[in-house]
Amino acid sequence: KKHTGETEYFYRSVVCMITGKSPHVILGQEMLKPRDGSGKDEGELTGGKRLIERLKKRHGHFADVIVADALYLNAPFINTLKENGLEGVIRLKDERRMIFQDAEHLFKQDEGKKASFWKGKKKIEVWDLSGFKMEGCPYKLRVVRYHEQWEENGKETERFMWLVTTLE
């Protein structure tokens, strides 16, 4: 209920779509199931795994790579991807995670492949390191780090990390 006492109804879902160049096609949508009582509603992870399995069953090979935010960085989701013939690129941003800390430590020691180049006024550095493991996940994983620097009213910096399931 809203603070006005009026009941609000809404739906939650997970969507799988083709991104990049047009057309942006929605391949499937999975509604998240509400729970009665005091229990929490079904989460995105459960719906996301169910959607992947349904799309695989319906379409066979429907994608090469699934790109997901940091919420999906866990062994059950990665296992679902791999078991359905998919690769994943998943945002790695929680600095408390061991895989993040291990990757940062190795990158600081200049481990892994590193490329550096300029794009306009931006200096871009990319690192790639393989051989990571995650509890409950039998697959070897990679971490890719992207760092961007540029000057504009002082120094600005942006850094991203992704966990990648493909080893190539």
Where are these regions (language model features)?
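Conserved, well-structured functional cores that handle cations and Mg-NTP chemistry
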Residues: 1-90
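An anionic, glycine-rich sequence signature occurring as long contiguous blocks
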Residues: 87-168
